[in-house]
């Protein structure tokens, strides 16, 4: 009887995933997905590229074992709870007016 009980316990442990897997938002496509084993941090990386003035900052979301290092023009935030790296909610830059009126507005 003890052998049967021990066998059931071992089978249960093998079949169940007892290790917790962090879930983070990832880009391309933007959705929440489980992270790979050992990756327990979510990160949000933002930077300006050539489209920054029209579309706003570029954004990369993902999982990491350690918080990614940044380049001088990048900003990175890391967090350690499920889905804590939502897409940043900021206003897109407004296009500047063009034409004669814009030159008047530029010099009040």
Curated annotation (Swiss-Prot):
Would the keyword Secreted be found if you checked this record's keyword annotation?
A: yes
UniProt KW Disulfide bond keyword: yes
Q: Which InterPro entries match?
A: Snake_3FTx (IPR003571), Snake_toxin-like_sf (IPR045860), Snake_toxin_con_site (IPR018354), Toxin_cobra-type (IPR054131)
Kindly give the Gene3D superfamilies that the UniProt entry links to this protein: CD59
Listed SUPFAM superfamilies? Snake toxin-like
**Assigned GO CC terms:** extracellular region
- According to the record, the signal peptide region is 1-21
Q: Which CDD domains match?
A: TFP_snake_toxin (cd00206)
Citing just one GO molecular function, the answer is: ion channel regulator activity
A single Pfam family it belongs to is: Toxin_cobra-type
What the protein does?
Binds with high affinity to muscular (alpha-1/CHRNA1) and neuronal (alpha-7/CHRNA7) nicotinic acetylcholine receptor (nAChR) and inhibits acetylcholine from binding to the receptor, thereby impairing neuromuscular and neuronal transmission.
The entry sums up its family as follows: Belongs to the three-finger toxin family. Long-chain subfamily. Type II alpha-neurotoxin sub-subfamily.
Q: What is this protein called?
A: Long neurotoxin 43
Q: State the species of origin.
A: Drysdalia coronoides
Q: What is the lineage of its organism?
A: Eukaryota, Metazoa, Chordata, Craniata, Vertebrata
């Amino acid at each position: 009887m003890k052998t049967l009980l021990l066998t059931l316990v071992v089978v249960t442990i093998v079949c169940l995933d007892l290790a917790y897997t962090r879930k983070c938002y990832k880009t391309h496509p933007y959705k929440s997905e489980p992270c790979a084993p050992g990756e327990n941090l979510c990160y949000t990386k933002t930077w300006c590229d050539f489209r920054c003035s029209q579309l706003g900052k570029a954004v990369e979301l993902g999982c990491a074992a350690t918080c990614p290092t940044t380049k001088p023009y990048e900003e990175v935030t890391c967090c350690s709870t499920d889905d804590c790296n939502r897409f940043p909610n900021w206003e897109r830059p407004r296009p500047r007016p063009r034409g004669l009126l814009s030159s008047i507005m530029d010099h009040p």
